[in-house]
């Protein structure tokens, strides 16, 4: 039996209606547009997911996708709460999914997003 939990994540990564889905028995977190990557990535990886997403965000903010991802004062807390679920799989919508310690990748993503969007705030001024 599968048990799914809907987790509202307003404005993470986009609009007020954003949400993640967590399957409790397999510990799979469906992460929507978090961890987006481009190109032709492998279907599943076991390391480096947050690093790939960080690089994508840096490129995206210099392209027509600038400002498409939101990071606000509640975003880090939302990512920390998702990490507390202890996901073993991160099911990614646009890029490689991840098998392993998903909590670490979520926390690394929070730091990566802070890095990208603090730089953007300085640029936008």
Predicted segments with their positions:
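Context-gated lysine
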Residues: 2, 88, 118-119
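Beta-strand-turn-beta hairpins that frame and shape the catalytic cleft
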Residues: 1-5, 25-28
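C-terminal regulatory/interaction regions
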Residues: 99-100, 104-125
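Metallo-beta-lactamase
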Residues: 10-101, 111-114
């Amino acid at each position: 039996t599968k048990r799914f939990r809907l987790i509202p994540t307003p404005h993470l990564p986009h609009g007020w209606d954003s949400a993640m889905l967590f399957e409790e028995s397999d510990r799979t977190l469906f992460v929507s547009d978090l961890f987006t990557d481009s190109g032709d990535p492998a279907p599943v990886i076991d390391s480096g997911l947050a690093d790939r997403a960080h690089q994508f965000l840096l490129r995206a903010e210099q392209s027509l996708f600038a400002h498409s991802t939101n990071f606000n004062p509640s975003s880090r807390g939302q990512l920390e709460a998702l990490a507390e679920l202890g996901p073993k799989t991160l099911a990614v919508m646009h890029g490689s999914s991840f098998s392993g310690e998903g909590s670490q990748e979520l926390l690394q993503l929070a730091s990566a997003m802070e890095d990208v969007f603090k730089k953007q705030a300085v640029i936008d001024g």
